[in-house]
């Protein structure tokens, strides 16, 4: 069975067997504890096994995976510590993506694909507004209308508002103040660059599953230096991607080597102020997506950043350092 060497402590090797890779994991530790280094090791080793992956690059640290490294004093010292005589430097196949379409390959998603639950989270809607948005999606579906971009959704909201009496029989009262609040939130999202993200053509799943001539899986890197300043768009897109994989990939059951790996950096951003409905959807997706051959890894400072409903599904737990007893218990 293939395995990945993660590190060593007190002459004990830490190995991750490939059969555990689709049972998900978490990497925790404070700033400077080498969480990103650990993540990059996993990305490299997964690539060698032919496993494509998707990772959010928060500070530009992951881009170097596409370049061949070179030896220096720190690396020599590290090799001695690990009792490794040699180390082969190599560049890994990478693909760069960008929601804001500034430098890399554009990443797009239609409003219909995002769905009302995740979109309500992006917009920060309350319970009443979320219910109205959900009704608008249902009405559009009944009328065979595809909501491709923000303009489509705005037009649909205005249409429903203007004909509220007609729809109130089946969907309840849709107060104009609530509709206006949703429209204001959409306007703010548009100003943040949401009009670039919510458009077509959408990403093709096959573009993420590529391998190079050596059989190495591509590491798909999402540029997040700008995206990190838009936490609602960041969290919504990554959750959409996870749902997209789950809904699109066929069932394959437990496999010796997973088909794909997904890395959520700054995982706390996914769960800040999350609704119970969306959390329940994420928990279900994480629990079931392993049968699609997908491994999911969360990277964050504190293991308590990840809700218990999610962390209970994570079998591989790597911690650089843990201070509080409550954190140690979670890991």
Locations of the language-model features?
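Pre-Walker A (Motif I) flank of P-loop NTPase domains
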Residues: 12, 20-25, 216-220
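A short helix-turn-beta junction within AAA+ P-loop NTPase domains corresponding to the substrate/partner-engaging
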Residues: 309-321
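The conserved Walker
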Residues: 27-31, 303
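Conserved lysine of the Walker
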Residues: 35
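P-loop NTPase motor domains
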Residues: 43-52, 60-287, 310
